[in-house]
Amino acid sequence: MTKLNAQVKGSLNVTTPGVQIWRIEAMQMVPVSSSTYGSFFDGDCYIVLAIHKTGSNLSYDIHYWIGQDSSQDEQGAAAIYTTLMDDFLKGRAVQHREVQGNESEAFRGYFKQGIVIRKGGVASGMKKVETNSYDIQRLLHVKGKRNVVAGEVEMSWKSFNRGDVFLLDLGKLIIQWNGPESNRMERLRGMTLAKEIRDQERGGRTYVGVVDGEDEKASPQLMEIMNYVLGQRKELKAAVPDTVVEPALKAALKLYHVSDSEGKVVVREVATRPLTQDLLSHEDCYILDQGGLKIYVWKGKNANPQEKKEAMNQALNFIKAKQYPPSTQVEVQNDGAESAVFQQLFQKWTVPNQTSGLGKTHTVGSVAKVEQVKFDATSMHVQPQVAAQQKMVDDGSGEVEIWRIENLDLVPVESKWVGHFYGGDCYLLLYTYLIGEKQHYLLYIWQGSQASQDEITASAYQAVILDQKYNNEPVQIRVPMGKEPPHLMSIFKGRMVVYQGGTSRANSTEPVPSTRLFQVRGTSVNNTKAFEVPARATSLNSNDIFVLKTQSCCYLWCGKGCSGDEREMAKMVADTISRTEKQVVVEGQEPANFWVALGGKAPYASSKRLQEETLVITPRLFECSNQTGRFLATEIPDFNQDDLEEDDVFLLDVWDQVFFWIGKNANEDEKKAAAVTAQEYLKTHPSGRDPETPIIVVKQGYEPPTFTGWFLAWDPFKWSDSKSYEDLKAELGNSGDWSQITAEIKNPKPDVFNANTNLSSGPLPIFPLEQLVNKPAEELPQGVDPSRREEHLSIEDFTKALGMTPAAFSALPRWKQQNLKKEKGLF
């Protein structure tokens, strides 16, 4: 087992995106049929390779999954093969350790229809998942709201609780029982899994029935079957609350240096949050502890080979030393092939030798390179991915209405002040644009840095009222002063001016400064603004253009590093600042009065600026909730439009903007708390995010291309064609002849047990226990079937000998029945 065998290499596809699975059999990797992906035996270990494609780049994740009843040898083999596969991929993969019952969201996300965990394993004769087999009796406990995992539990009412979904699988019939406290999404996921079992394992020849626990009387025949199989029910157990992970734990980062240079492994804490990339040395290995929730191991490319080889063991030893649960998730990161999730635990992440445009050497929170596309307004709706990267829904030529907050109310801004934004004010801007014949709206909420808290609160309140006036269709964009997005600037065609403070109100008594200095940034009408800075020489920068307005004249100061396009745009915006003739001043040739106006010469930034970074980021989607009174965000890996559920709210993080998507059936409290929830996300982000990051609220059905462009193949008609839980339940309810199925189940074959089976009245004669236990076949009484000794027992003797009722015994997999009979001398 020192290298990947030829069979594995032959079956290994490293160029096609998707999932490949192997099972450990006799210490070898054996490919699993794709028709059974999503089914795992708890007595086995598996290796799952996931390949992702971003642009032209491929990335790899290797997960090894440990069943709760697997052997130590199998677990060790899975870990070794994971390392060998990573070596085969030249260290480009992220390794994950997955333990049954505590699988990562990334792992669950590969199996959109759900995961089914079965009893048994290859060592006990369970070679594969049988299809088109109806000789089945099992109870599946379905857990999870989004990517579900269903595990076999004891086939008894004792296994049920009020808060979860259960599938009673009887071969020709699957009954889904929904706990009265389960939610619609959990029920829908359970139904999807039931249909998957029906279609994939039974060729569509199994009936599916649904019982809602709060209204069992509506399904009398299905309840009759359940009580027949499971026995009469007693009081149901209370709902088991889902595990809640505090955001503070996710943000609790500690970095440890790992070394064995002295002959023994030494783990030493070197830093806590916030973390910076320069803490990681290429010559060493590190452990990053995320509040005990997940352990990352980072392997420097020049680290000791033995240290790198032992990375996973180091993590497991660390977990033991910290007394964390054995099921704690572990990821091994290779130097240069880190996942986006790992990178975003750091304040800033540099990708060496990656350029996009002249002089750009790195991107924030990114591993993907995206080709820069020249702005073309006509492409925004045809190519929403371009709109997403450019952050533009169009070229800003739509209709505009602007209001200022005055006395906590909305007052229209006079035309002469349109484009002027004062730091002491808050503004609402409604932008209307067309896609085809349909009107769409953007509602910008601009909040000055010196505005009062009452005005900021009023701006949010007035935005809600305006939103309702337009039938909740506008996309709301919160813009803190200084964070103006490109599209907002494009509306003013290069004439946007932002003042440090003050107001444009007619009755203002605030004095206007006699000298003002504005820094101008931008190369076109779509990205230019002038931003007021302190009127002193230290504010200057050789890379930019500045407008200096005095009582007597207006200077246009051009730094040596500015371009011709920047000079042209500066002339345009300068006309907005002052109507007087502009005196162009080249850096180094300033007249004396220029320095007098700035209070005298002083040193200023004159080093050449690196090319402006265009952020190329890895977008991340989170399902959000505050139902427990605490903000929770669950990441959805490899997301697509199907992950956006109508009952929920979601957060799409594209680093320099945060979108908050609201489903039409979302909780009212969550709708109202959208902006607050997004701000809480930024505050609790492990990397220490800028709390002033713009927040954009998007409603289902009114998504702008700047949002849809982050999703592959967005379908605007998706929700109009989708089926609700009630629709699917109605369909399934019409599929079964329950009376015929009930008759078949209540008159089973002789070798099928249920809670009401009376063995003494069956076709087989009854004998005392001592005549059947540990007896060779030739010594058994006449009439005894040696392979069915347990069926010749009275119920009392059966329970005494096997330690369970016949119904519980019949619920066990055949391999477990056989093992138990051997153990008790009845085989």
From Swiss-Prot:
The gene is VIL1. Pfam families: Gelsolin, VHP. Residues 816-824 are annotated as: LPA/PIP2-binding site 3. One of its GO terms (cellular component) is lamellipodium. Gene3D superfamilies: Severin, Villin headpiece domain. Residues 112-119 are annotated as: LPA/PIP2-binding site 1. Residues 1-126 are annotated as: Necessary for homodimerization. Residues 761-827 form the HP domain. The modification Phosphoserine is found at S366, S735. Belongs to the villin/gelsolin family. Consists of a large core fragment in the N-terminal portion and a small headpiece (HP) in the C-terminal portion. The core fragment is necessary for both actin-nucleating and -severing activities, whereas the HP binds F-actin strongly in both the presence and absence of calcium and is necessary in actin-bundling activity. The Gelsolin-like 1 repeat is necessary for the actin-capping activity. The entire core fragment is necessary for the actin-severing activity. Keywords: Actin capping, Actin-binding, Apoptosis, Calcium, Cell projection, Cytoplasm, Cytoskeleton, Phosphoprotein, Repeat. This is Villin-1. Phosphorylated on tyrosine residues by SRC. The unphosphorylated form increases the initial rate of actin-nucleating activity, whereas the tyrosine-phosphorylated form inhibits actin-nucleating activity, enhances actin-bundling activity and enhances actin-severing activity by reducing high Ca(2+) requirements. The tyrosine-phosphorylated form does not regulate actin-capping activity. Gelsolin-like repeats lie at residues 28-107, 148-216, 269-342, 409-489, 528-595, 634-707. Its main location: cytoplasm. It comes from Sus scrofa. The keyword Endoplasmic reticulum does not apply. The keyword Calcium applies. GO terms for biological process: actin filament capping; actin filament depolymerization; actin filament polymerization; actin filament severing; actin polymerization or depolymerization; apoptotic process; barbed-end actin filament capping; cellular response to epidermal growth factor stimulus. Monomer. Homodimer; homodimerization is necessary for actin-bundling. Associates with F-actin; phosphorylation at tyrosine residues decreases the association with F-actin. Interacts (phosphorylated at C-terminus tyrosine phosphorylation sites) with PLCG1 (via the SH2 domains). Interacts (phosphorylated form) with PLCG1; the interaction is enhanced by hepatocyte growth factor (HGF). GO terms for molecular function: actin filament binding; calcium ion binding; cysteine-type endopeptidase inhibitor activity involved in apoptotic process; lysophosphatidic acid binding; phosphatidylinositol-4,5-bisphosphate binding; protein homodimerization activity. Residues 138-146 are annotated as: LPA/PIP2-binding site 2. Residues 1-734 are annotated as: Core. Epithelial cell-specific Ca(2+)-regulated actin-modifying protein that modulates the reorganization of microvillar actin filaments. Plays a role in the actin nucleation, actin filament bundle assembly, actin filament capping and severing. Binds phosphatidylinositol 4,5-bisphosphate (PIP2) and lysophosphatidic acid (LPA); binds LPA with higher affinity than PIP2. Binding to LPA increases its phosphorylation by SRC and inhibits all actin-modifying activities. Binding to PIP2 inhibits actin-capping and -severing activities but enhances actin-bundling activity. It is found in: Cytoplasm, Cytoskeleton; Cell projection, Lamellipodium; Cell projection, Ruffle; Cell projection, Microvillus. It comes from the Eukaryota.
